[in-house]
Amino acid sequence: MKHLRAPLQSRVVQWLVSPGASVGANEVVVILEAMKMEHEIRAPSAMRITELLFAPGDVVQDNEVLCLCEPAAAVAALPEDSGHSKAAAQTHDAAPVRADLERLLARAALTQDASRPEAVAKRHTLGLRTARENLADLCDANTFIEYGALAVAAQRSRRSQEDLERHTPADGMVTGIGRVNEQPVVAMAYDATVLAGTQGMRNHQKTDRMLGLALQNKLPVVLFAEGGGGRPGDVDMPIVAGLHVGTFASFARLNGQVPVVGIAAGRCFAGNAALLGCCDVIIATRDSNIGMGGPAMVEGGGLGVFKPEQIGPSSVQQANGVIDVLVDDEAQAVAVARQYLSYFQGPRTDVVAPPENALREVVPQNRLRVYDARDAMQGVADVGSLLHLRSGFGVGIHTALARVGGRPVGLLANNPLHLGGAIDAPAADKAARFMQLCNAHGLPLISLVDTPGFMVGPDTEATAQVRHVSRMFVAAAHLRVPYLSVVMRKGYGLGAMAMTAGGFHSPLFTAAWPTAEFGAMGLEGAVRLGFRKELDAVPDGPQRQALFEELLARQVDNGSAIHMATTLEIDAVIDPAQTRHWLITGLQSAKVAPLSGVASIDTW
């Protein structure tokens, strides 16, 4: 019979059996202490204890016999997974909750919405959701793990611990990691029901922790940014102004490295708005207000007295380009955020192609008739995959994320409904930033061209047009992603070159529809400028107009898509119905070049 031996040098703390007792296999016989930690020594098999060789307090050596035993086959063995004692053989459901766990559960419950019904009801009365409701909707079911849930406001010197636990849960910032579309994402939400969603010292620490994890592990970030900025009431920290806080620099450092999504509902002012402005994309509800200072700051600066809803309403912030996607409510904002992230989570196989022949009808037969270029975007993108960005700003160029043949891409298209498709400063800014966004995150770009060129004239030059439109050339020159161009109708001058990444031979291909026409400048202007002498020689009236029409017809023919293809200035003239085939083949042929250094995306 093998006697029970000590597995290490230790001290006997307690015998759980007496001589003559029978024990089952895996039952605890004695407690030993070593290095201030207690070890349970179990019976290797069913046995009867005949003699205890050491008393409590005695020191035993490694492998020394602790007690004499003899076989006791009739003693039932405890199952291996029975727990640490006979008492633990009870089922987990029946076992009482330990005191330490009970304290944790009670404390954790205070962080949940159920513990604050009045605050939740007030939120719902405003037509808004709580921070936790938004995060639960954003993340796949049961995937969110929360960091820093037990934090409270740094106000212990002026408020009781119980008060802080009940009224400043998570210090007004819910942070963690969850999965969106089955891929990990850092998710953070300011809690507007806690101190108006202001930025406290503890929630800055929590934010910094999550931003570090996002950067280190290359995780996308979603921020619900509602709140009132800095919090002066945190008095536990021995600081004066708090301008050393690293949150803003850490958040900005994510730019171009991971997708960063900002969501605004309700009031988003000051520091909260500064973080929102660093995001790749801003999704905002119609009732939102976004501004670098709320009413108190505006009034304090002697700038007047305003209500919150008068500062940065969505109608202003969408038109000026601050808001990328305007939605009705937070539920729609979350749905858009999930859709936006999906473009950076790889290709899809559940592709539904739009009707091919529909593209043949997009451009009117009358070359002077305007049309909606978004129909062309709809015609090349997989069904249901279009997400337009900044649709209320820079309306001269449409920008959208989409999929073509399952591959995520960025789409640009001139808008003939605005200035005939001419590119003005806002449109150029919008297009250049969109190129940077797609380039940073590896999305190929597809350009649908119909432009008479850059907008000109004294009023236009007053907008710094020269600088703004040149952004398109600079952004395109630094692209590492494939660029594919299709000229639908007008391809004139420098504007057409800017829409084709700097020139018709810069893209992977520049194809044209039969409706396309080309020239170094607008054809009408080219005739008036190049044939001024001939036109002036003819009397003003029907005769001069007839000559003008004749000369214009020659220019249109000379600048036709077919003629351009014969001189190899473009790569092909294609049936519009074959556009998706060309794009899909091109996307399959081209590679995304490795990123050299860190990409950046302008905030504007």
Q: PLM features: residue spans?
A:
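Short, solvent-exposed beta-edge and connector elements
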Residues: 6-12, 35, 41-48, 65
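Short, acidic, Ser/Thr-enriched surface-loop or helix-capping motifs
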Residues: 7, 44, 54, 225, ...
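Exposed loop and linker-edge segments at protein-protein interfaces
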Residues: 16, 22, 51-54, 59
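Short, compositionally biased
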Residues: 42-48, 73-92
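Acidic, low-complexity mobile loops and tails
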Residues: 1-31
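Short hydrophobic beta/alpha edge segments that flank linear recognition/processing sites
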Residues: 21-42, 61-77
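Ligand-binding clefts of soluble mixed alpha/beta catalytic domains
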Residues: 83-604
